[in-house]
């Protein structure tokens, strides 16, 4: 048997590729980061084979580039992701997310009494690292949650 080195997800001419997303996290990223709020073509690969992760997800968005803030906010969900900026089918920049100090507009506060759940305000969380565990503190109710609690609420 010969190994076939074909791309499993079609290459894009210009745009962003988010690679090395943990398996089953790709759809959540599309929703949370509002990546589908575009008329550009989006290609998603789910449960693709990965030497590092075993399985991974992949997102390709044509003619769209993530801001540095968006790239860094990915670190909460996909700390080992790589974000590639593509032009003329070539990688022109390769970025790794860095944990930001703050995450805005992406997450929902788990506190059902928080004003951010009922008022037209953008959510905002301070990111804290405590003993190798991430905690997120809501700007409005000032409650602090383990990051997995906020993620499950997303």
UniProtKB/Swiss-Prot annotation:
One Gene Ontology term from the biological process aspect of the record: pyrimidine nucleotide biosynthetic process
UniProt superkingdom: Bacteria
Record key words, sorted: Metal-binding, Pyrimidine biosynthesis, Zinc
One function term, GO molecular function aspect: metal ion binding
Cofactor binding comment, as recorded: Binds 1 zinc ion per subunit.
Binding site for Zn(2+): 109, 114, 138, 141
Signal peptide interval: none
Cofactor: Zn(2+)
One Gene Ontology cellular component annotation held by this UniProt entry: aspartate carbamoyltransferase complex
Function, in words: Involved in allosteric regulation of aspartate carbamoyltransferase.
Name of protein: Aspartate carbamoyltransferase regulatory chain
Encoding gene per record: pyrI
């Amino acid at each position: 048997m010969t190994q076939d080195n074909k791309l499993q997800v079609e290459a894009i001419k210009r745009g962003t590729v988010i690679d090395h997303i943990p398996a089953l996290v790709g759809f959540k990223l599309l929703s949370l980061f509002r990546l589908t709020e575009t008329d550009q073509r989006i290609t998603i690969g789910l449960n693709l084979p990965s030497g590092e992760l075993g399985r991974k997800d992949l997102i390709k968005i044509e003619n769209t580039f993530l801001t540095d803030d968006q790239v860094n906010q990915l670190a909460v969900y996909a700390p080992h992701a790589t974000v590639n900026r593509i032009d003329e089918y070539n990688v022109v920049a390769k970025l790794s997310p860095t944990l930001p100090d703050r995450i805005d507009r992406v997450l929902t506060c788990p506190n059902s009494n928080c004003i951010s759940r009922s008022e037209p305000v953008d959510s905002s969380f301070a990111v804290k690292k405590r003993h190798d565990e991430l905690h997120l503190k809501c700007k409005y109710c000032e409650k602090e949650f383990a990051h997995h609690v906020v993620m499950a609420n997303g």
